[in-house]
């Protein structure tokens, strides 16, 4: 795909939420400017070298490029003979209200649907799971009604493609009800919560049968990759207990009980405090995808990082003909204003196109770039509580964060970004946050006190 030469083309190719397919020409390898950790190769080797099933976590700020890297991992695993089930969890479930039983249901749905579409016969395991759901999830008389409704939908071609096993329709209905219905969601969760061992056993029966069938076809094993779990909303449930802890720590054992290789994305905020230590005891490995280093730590003299800035320019130029559409000053402004965050970089480019001046030979002007940045600054201003600014200034001055709930929340909201310098991570305040009036006032206040 050649770089876009019109504003319309540029607007669409700069879509900040679209992960790139593995062989997309727009892909820019940023491994060396993220800290020299090749996360895709590490996750691949963990799976391909291990005789036992592995359960790994993958994290990084939302929008840093995790989905693109996971799609590359999927391609590499499939090329090595693995059967990969990849899906984004928010396509099935609501990240604002998601618990581990919901996730297990979603994995079951995806495994059943994909194996059926690929003509991998799971045989009697499907019937056993279907019978179990009929007995456990539905009350007497409910199942017959649901069964008839789903059969009618299948006959007239509603919903899933024809030919999928009946249990695929059952699981699709259940995940859909959990995503959209409050009362029925509570009922389903209550009934499943009392039967977790049986739910996992049934899912493992499906995975065991899938393993047998894919190996019979000459492949190695099943691997499940669950993307976008890092979008699960952070909720303080009291007593230092959060929604993230509930999913990945308190019930992490259940997520690791599946008889297949698994990779789950996880919020980057969980890499600090007690959460990190607890995760290390549950999952085999947690891989971090840091920001692109657009600058050096302030504690080491600061200044731009030439390699990182070059790579950010490459990301823009692979997508759009910047020489034809952008003022050079605008391109530089985008790269500095994003803080090395790929999605924010694309967001700034796309929003600046909305402010482009058609009268100019290069319509994406520096003025348009500044207006786009103003929208990002405004978004942060509505998000950050006033008590956080003193702590944000401390992060700005030290390039370090504390391992407490407030700093975890800053990482989750991306008001603080994580970078890597070899094996040692460092942190900085997002450039847009640095321009907020409240931040500048607190920074000036701290300098007066120090002076």
Predicted regions and their residues:
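Extended alpha-helical interface modules used as scaffolds for assembling large macromolecular complexes
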Residues: 1-13, 310-311, 315-323, 352, ...
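C-terminal leucine-rich, beta-strand-based interaction scaffolds used for sensing/assembly
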Residues: 2, 363-451
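Amphipathic alpha-helical "lid/sensor" segments that cap RecA-like P-loop NTPase cores
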Residues: 327-379
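Walker A/P-loop-proximal flanking segment of P-loop NTPase domains
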Residues: 1-77, 81-83
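A short acidic (Asp/Glu
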Residues: 69-71, 96-99, 233-239, 273-279, ...
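The catalytic "switch" region of P-loop NTPases
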Residues: 192, 204-328
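P-loop NTPase nucleotide-binding core
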Residues: 54-55, 60-219
């Amino acid at each position: 795909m050649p770089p876009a030469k019109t504003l319309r083309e540029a607007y669409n190719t700069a879509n900040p939420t679209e992960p790139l397919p593995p062989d997309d020409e727009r892909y820019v390898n940023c491994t060396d400017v993220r800290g020299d950790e090749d996360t895709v190769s590490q996750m691949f080797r963990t799976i391909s070298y291990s005789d036992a099933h592995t359960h790994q976590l993958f994290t990084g700020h939302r929008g840093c490029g995790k989905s693109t890297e996971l799609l590359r991992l999927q391609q590499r695993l499939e090329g090595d003979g693995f059967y990969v089930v990849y899906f984004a969890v928010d396509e099935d479930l609501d990240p604002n209200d998601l618990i581990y039983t919901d996730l297990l249901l979603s994995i079951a749905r995806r495994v059943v649907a994909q194996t059926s579409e690929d003509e991998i016969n799971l045989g009697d395991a499907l019937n056993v799971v279907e019978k179990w759901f009929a007995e456990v999830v539905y009350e007497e008389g409910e199942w017959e009604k649901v069964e008839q409704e789903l059969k009618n939908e299948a006959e007239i071609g509603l919903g899933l493609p024809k030919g999928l096993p009946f249990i695929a329709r059952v699981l699709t209905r259940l995940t859909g009800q959990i995503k959209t219905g409050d009362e029925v969601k509570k009922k389903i969760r209550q009934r499943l919560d009392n039967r977790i061992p049986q739910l996992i056993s049934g899912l493992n029966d499906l995975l065991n049968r899938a393993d047998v069938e894919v190996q019979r076809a000459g492949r190695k094993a099943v691997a499940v990759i669950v993307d976008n779990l890092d979008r699960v909303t952070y909720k303080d449930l009291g007593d230092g207990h959060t929604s993230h802890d509930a999913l990945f720590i308190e019930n992490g054992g259940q997520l690791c009980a599946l008889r297949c290789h698994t990779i789950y994305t996880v919020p980057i905020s969980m890499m600090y405090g007690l959460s990190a230590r607890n995760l290390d005891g549950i999952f085999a490995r947690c891989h971090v995808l840091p920001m692109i280093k657009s600058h050096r730590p302030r504690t080491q003299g600061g200044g731009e990082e030439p390699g990182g800035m070059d790579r950010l320019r490459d990301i823009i130029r692979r997508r759009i003909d910047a020489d034809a559409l952008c003022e050079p000053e605008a391109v530089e402004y985008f790269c500095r204003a994003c803080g090395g965050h790929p999605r924010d970089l694309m967001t700034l480019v796309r929003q600046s196109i909305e402010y482009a001046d058609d009268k100019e030979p290069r319509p994406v002007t520096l003025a348009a770039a500044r207006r786009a940045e103003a929208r990002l600054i405004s978004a942060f201003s509505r998000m950050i509580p006033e008590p956080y600014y003193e702590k944000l200034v401390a992060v700005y001055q030290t390039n370090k964060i504390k391992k407490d709930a407030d700093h975890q929340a800053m990482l989750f909201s991306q008001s603080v970004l994580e970078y890597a310098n070899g094996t040692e991570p460092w942190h900085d305040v997002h450039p847009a946050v640095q321009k907020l009036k409240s931040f500048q006032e607190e920074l000036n206040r701290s300098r007066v006190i120090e002076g």
